[in-house]
Amino acid sequence: MIVIPDVILLGASAILGLYLGWAYLRRLPRRPVLVGSHLLLGAAGLEIMVVLLRGTPSGQSLALGVVGALAISLTALALLSGLIAGLIARRSRRTADVTLATHAAVAVAGFGLFVAWAIKA
């Protein structure tokens, strides 16, 4: 049950990301505080995932396996693509659509794999 805080952090980031995506599609004004919170929750979740690579605080080793390694890789790629999306999306609406769709797809895959790994851990 050591992975529960990470599931909560990444789940909150995913829910906030869903809201931000919905607001983007509705062309509502962007709220930098929500975008920053989404970024911080995702980064904190990724940090805990990386810390769990070394084992739990009690010294117990978690079997990472291919699923866990892929979940960490996809979550890191989602964080990177989200940062890139924020930088290059200001050029055109089409560029923003493609980068945000890529970010969302990678993030959903990473979160899904992480939850699958967390259930086994």
Where are these regions (language model features)?
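Membrane-embedded alpha-helical bundles that constitute the cytochrome b-like, heme-associated redox core
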Residues: 1-121
